[in-house]
Amino acid sequence: MTASRRTLMVMAGGTGGHVFPGLAVAHRMEAAGWRVVWLGNPAGMEATLVPKHGIPMEYVRFGGLRGKGLKTKLTLPFNLLRACWQSLGALRRVRPDVVLGMGGYITFPAGVMAALSGRPLVLHEQNSIAGLANKVLAKFAKRVLVAFPGALPHAEWTGNPIRAELARTETPQARYASRSGPLNLLVVGGSLGAAALNEVVPRALALLAPGERPRVVHQAGAKHIDALKANYEAAGFAGGDAVRLVPFIDDMASAYAAADLVICRSGAMTVSEIAAVGVAALFVPFPYAVDDHQTTNAAFLADAGAAVLVQQRDLSAELLADWLRSQSRASLADMAERSRSLAKPEATDEVARICATVAGANLEEIK
């Protein structure tokens, strides 16, 4: 069987943290001549996003239990049985050579049926604390891969698959050494915005003397951009070249590479991307993340002196202003170098190679 006739089924859904690394691997496999089919939830973000990438989909209806009411919990056995039956149908139609589970509730019924039907299963856990589905499915998988060491027992540390352009940036040493003048600060609130960052950062910058202030790019999400502008105006910033407020950033690789410091949440993909680029970061974990996984994600870099971790409850304008005063481009460059040293920039290729191996393909098919 040639590589062009081999098929990978990717199971992932629910959030971008599962879908985007799955897409990175999917495109890598397609580039090697593989057929890729995606298994997802018709109500999930993957149903809109994945077809835009030209990848055909199979659908299974299944959702999570966390925070759901009694009715959802009582109907779980029926919903799980239906999802298993739908998954089996998809597996029979697609007949994949290997199934890659990238996380999300959808992976549980599909992963179980893949194992029971004899389809080799590869799992990848993006977070530093494994989700329930992957904890169970790890017992049935041929290979278990993790983005952070220790997330699952007996797993292989591959890192998180990321977009290729993030791994192609100049070294931190070259970037930081070429700069002069005020520091370049990137604040990333994400598509949903991060109210704590949007409120504290403008007030912290106002506490700095004009000569101490960095140049700022602050991304806040389309729904929060007006409130962010009001926060900066209330802090005494009338706009101008030194502060740029944007609802979204299309080219995150360039934005990270242009920054001396990033202030952001610590989702798994954010941490992995920052390490891949090699940029200093101050992480403020989302305090309501499942199992507080954002704290342990950030700790992976912070414990190595490659980032700073501040809990949201401890974040204040005064604390942030004092910390910014204590930093120099040289100190941030050192942090960025440490971050880059912990990155796994070849994660996409490595996960692709492992999938090929499990399917019985030659490694040369993934170049």
Swiss-Prot record:
Top-level EC class as recorded in UniProt: transferase
This protein's UniProt keywords: Cell cycle, Cell division, Cell inner membrane, Cell membrane, Cell shape, Cell wall biogenesis/degradation, Glycosyltransferase, Membrane, Peptidoglycan synthesis, Transferase
Enzyme Commission identifier(s): 2.4.1.227
Pfam family, one: Glyco_tran_28_C
Swiss-Prot/TrEMBL GO biological process terms: carbohydrate metabolic process; cell division; cell wall organization; lipid glycosylation; peptidoglycan biosynthetic process; regulation of cell shape
Pathway the protein takes part in: Cell wall biogenesis; peptidoglycan biosynthesis
InterPro entries found in the cross-reference section: GlcNAc_MurG (IPR006009), Glyco_trans_28_C (IPR007235), GlycoTrans_28_N (IPR004276)
GO MF term list: UDP-N-acetyl-D-glucosamine:N-acetylmuramoyl-L-alanyl-D-glutamyl-meso-2,6-diaminopimelyl-D-alanyl-D-alanine-diphosphoundecaprenol 4-beta-N-acetylglucosaminlytransferase activity; undecaprenyldiphospho-muramoylpentapeptide beta-N-acetylglucosaminyltransferase activity
Reactions it catalyzes: di-trans,octa-cis-undecaprenyl diphospho-N-acetyl-alpha-D-muramoyl-L-alanyl-D-glutamyl-meso-2,6-diaminopimeloyl-D-alanyl-D-alanine + UDP-N-acetyl-alpha-D-glucosamine = di-trans,octa-cis-undecaprenyl diphospho-[N-acetyl-alpha-D-glucosaminyl-(1->4)]-N-acetyl-alpha-D-muramoyl-L-alanyl-D-glutamyl-meso-2,6-diaminopimeloyl-D-alanyl-D-alanine + UDP + H(+)
Topology in membrane: Peripheral membrane protein
Keyword Glycosyltransferase set for record: yes
Gene3D superfamilies named among the record's database cross-references: Glycogen Phosphorylase B
Annotated compartments: Cell inner membrane
UniProt binding sites for UDP-N-acetyl-alpha-D-glucosamine: 15-17, 127, 163, 191, 249, 294
GO cellular component: plasma membrane
HAMAP family, per database record: MurG (MF_00033)
Function: Cell wall formation. Catalyzes the transfer of a GlcNAc subunit on undecaprenyl-pyrophosphoryl-MurNAc-pentapeptide (lipid intermediate I) to form undecaprenyl-pyrophosphoryl-MurNAc-(pentapeptide)GlcNAc (lipid intermediate II).
Family membership: Belongs to the glycosyltransferase 28 family. MurG subfamily.
Protein's UniProt name: UDP-N-acetylglucosamine--N-acetylmuramyl-(pentapeptide) pyrophosphoryl-undecaprenol N-acetylglucosamine transferase
